[in-house]
Amino acid sequence: MNNFLLEDIINKKLLSNQYQDTVPNGLQIEGTEIVKKIITGVTACQALLDKALFYNADTLIVHHGYFWKNESKYIHNMQRQRLKTILSHNINLYSWHLPLDVHPKLGNNAQIAKKLNIDIQGSILPYVLWGTTKNKMTGFEFANKIERKFKKYPIHLYENAPLYISRVAWCSGRGQGFIKKACAFGIDAFLTGEISEETTHIAKELGIHFFSLGHHATEKDGVKSLGEWLQRKYDLCVDFIDIYNPA
């Protein structure tokens, strides 16, 4: 498939033109014209680039790419090595950030709901969803379910929280700042990737369960599901590579 055609297909699927983002979405670095082997991953780190070379991939699709709004415009050290790897091997680098967080089927938030069997009821903010569990469960039962589905036990704050959880709000990645707005919807629990110092006090004083699973863990499934969709619909060769990241 032509590399610019692939960009157009994904932009249309993810409705990329509807979002104002802090990073360019789409084909960030042009490589070989014909896409034959795609690697997907969360972040375009050097380890993922090295894996792409190992598997003879000509294309990378990630959630966290390059050229962020507040990023230094100087190409030194780490960034120089990354770009050198991409350019010298004629690799296409694609990245979709917010469009891949919020897509109603493929997005990170939708994938969290799918994994945890949560019925989506609506959105609190564009990047924050809320829904209901199939059955009421204790906070510890919900934490154990998260561990089973994500292969990682979350940080769980539960002091002053209700015994049972049925109404849940969530936001992939760095969503801890939305906790107060989410609580206005009468939720029992809030799940996100990151946690801040003040989150402990906010969760306790608002009387909810708070679960932090890690930024990386909550944002693996969006780009993975995008790759699987490309494989099903266009018969492209796609593999997801998970570079370990505890954060």
UniProtKB/Swiss-Prot annotation:
Metal-binding keyword on record: yes
Native species: Buchnera aphidicola subsp. Acyrthosiphon pisum (strain APS)
Entry-linked InterPro entries: DUF34/NIF3 (IPR002678), DUF34/NIF3_sf (IPR036069)
Coiled-coil ranges per UniProt: none
Amino-acid positions noted as binding a divalent metal cation 2 in the UniProt annotation, renumbered to this chain: H64, H215, E219
Record keyword Magnesium present: no
GO molecular function: metal ion binding
Cystine pairs: none
Assembly and binders: Homohexamer.
Record's keyword terms, sorted: Metal-binding
GO cellular component terms, semicolon-separated: cytoplasm
Name assigned to this protein: GTP cyclohydrolase 1 type 2 homolog
Pfam families: DUF34_NIF3
Gene3D superfamilies given in the database record: NIF3 (NGG1p interacting factor 3)-like
Binding annotation for a divalent metal cation 1: H63, D101, E219
Family statement drawn from the similarity comment of this UniProt entry: Belongs to the GTP cyclohydrolase I type 2/NIF3 family.
